[in-house]
Design a protein with these regions (language model features):
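Structural signal for interior beta-strand "rungs" in well-ordered beta-sheet cores
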Residues: 150-197
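Terminal amphipathic alpha-helical/low-complexity segments used for targeting or macromolecular assembly
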Residues: 1-148
């Protein structure tokens, strides 16, 4: 037993610093809850509450990046600021275009709220859009943790390095794989069981 414990201790000492998947998963889910109240566990009805939650998330990302400098080649605070400065244009606006494509592209969709709350494709593309922005900022591992979290929940595996255009629609979702070298244009609709790249 002593030898086994020594092996485990060595493994723990050699493990590169990285935030726990639970920390990253919580960050992503909380961020998605701010962007889309349909995913929020709390109603942020007044601007003050929204600003506070937004600031908390920004600080959380700063802390994650500052404590894990091996995952990037920059300043954790600067990278977190860049992420939140680009969040509206690179994530929020594109997700609303994706939402529009999914709602209009699926005759069974009764409302955009249904797509946001129920469609695994929307959850997967949300994770991709967040992870892709982090990836473009030169942050490693964390983007992959986010897309793998979505993969475990949706059956959709999208590498954060893939290039996906605007108005992207994933219908049914299960069994979709989009690899790192994949380039998907604008206004593309993909059904279940498709591998690209």
């Amino acid at each position: 037993m002593e030898v086994f414990l020594n092996r485990l201790q060595k493994a723990h000492n050699l493990c590169p610093g990285c935030p726990s998947p639970k920390v990253i998963n919580r960050f992503f889910d909380d961020l998605l809850g701010i962007l889309f109240p349909e995913h929020s566990s709390e109603a942020l009805k007044d601007k003050g509450s929204l600003e506070l939650k937004f600031s908390e998330l920004k600080l959380q990302l700063q802390k994650i990046l500052t404590m894990n400098v091996a995952l990037h080649n920059g300043n954790g605070e600067d990278l977190a600021n860049q992420f939140f400065e680009k969040l509206e244009e690179e994530v929020y606006n594109k997700l609303h275009e994706d939402l529009d494509a999914m709602y209009k592209g699926d005759p069974a969709a009764k409302s955009k709220t249904e797509v946001i709350r129920c469609y695994p494709g929307f959850y997967a593309i949300s994770a991709y859009r967040v992870a892709h922005l982090l990836h473009r900022l030169g942050i490693s591992l964390i983007p992959r943790m986010i897309t793998e979290y979505a993969h475990s929940k949706t059956g959709v595996d999208i590498h954060p390095g893939a290039m996906i255009g605007r108005f992207f629609c994933i219908d049914h979702a299960t069994g979709i794989v989009i690899g790192e070298t994949t380039l998907v244009g604008d206004r593309v609709k993909i059904y279940q069981g498709v591998t690209l790249g």
